[in-house]
Amino acid sequence: MLELEESSKIIEKIKYNKPLIHHITNYVSVNDCANIVLALGGSPIMADDPKEVVEVVSKASALVINIGTLNDKRVQSMLLAGRKANELGIPVILDPVGVGASTFRKDTVNQLLKNIDFTVIRGNASEMQVLMNMNYSVAGVDSMDFGGNTPKMIRTLAQKYKTTVAITGATDSICDGTTLISVSNGHSLLSQVTGTGCMTTSLIATCLAVTDQALLAALAGVLIMDLAGEGAYASLKAHESIGTFKVRIFDHIHQLTEQTILEGGSLDVSYR
């Protein structure tokens, strides 16, 4: 499958280029996000003060904006860094963590979407449903309920925001508005580790840093986490559980090869 082959090639590009990935992210998973980028072969920097974000992002190959733990200062930094990244052609990925939890989060994401062009948006289905129903409207789409129809929602969302969207969950879906990819890899234990979604966003950003194909970068990032989850679970012994599982995720990503993706990836691709 072409998409699987092309996404697998990203692994070696990362190891060769060692791209700098700028994060403005939350303090819950920041250490894990830094380490996951390192495990894949990139170089993380977690700068979030308005006094330095423009300078830092100018040296980066991709920018992560994650709203997990918001405050006014961090929002200012997100806007400054995002605009500068757009100006320089640096890819930007949005992770709207818990966007439906508060008006502040929704207002912030609305502001970000109005002021920054995002290369990829990654979140879970409930977060994406909130984005779909926000007042920021393109082509008259204001409020829609897709009743669990993820393929329809993700296509509409990608078209609405003119971006590539990745919805992660039991089955992962990635769409650029035209091509829809469903990924059947992963393990249920991933949902019991705080920050695996944030780490997946960081993996996608690292992939974005070495390709201009956002759909393939999003696919590669999702597959890397899913296959690492499968491998980590398979390696557990009878007395080992969630803590060992988390550590093994990093081990498996560090040992990941192009062949791992080619042999392990399970995809379904449709076009429109």
Curated annotation (Swiss-Prot):
ATP binds at R122, T168. GO terms for biological process: thiamine biosynthetic process; thiamine diphosphate biosynthetic process. One of its GO terms (molecular function) is hydroxyethylthiazole kinase activity. Pfam families: HK. Its EC number is 2.7.1.50. It comes from the Bacteria. Pathway: Cofactor biosynthesis; thiamine diphosphate biosynthesis; 4-methyl-5-(2-phosphoethyl)-thiazole from 5-(2-hydroxyethyl)-4-methylthiazole: step 1/1. Substrate binds at M46, G195. Coiled coil: none annotated. Keywords: ATP-binding, Kinase, Magnesium, Metal-binding, Nucleotide-binding, Thiamine biosynthesis, Transferase. Its cofactor is Mg(2+). CDD domains: THZ_kinase. Gene3D superfamilies: 3.40.1190.20. It catalyses: 5-(2-hydroxyethyl)-4-methylthiazole + ATP = 4-methyl-5-(2-phosphooxyethyl)-thiazole + ADP + H(+). Belongs to the Thz kinase family. Catalyzes the phosphorylation of the hydroxyl group of 4-methyl-5-beta-hydroxyethylthiazole (THZ). This is Hydroxyethylthiazole kinase. The gene is thiM.
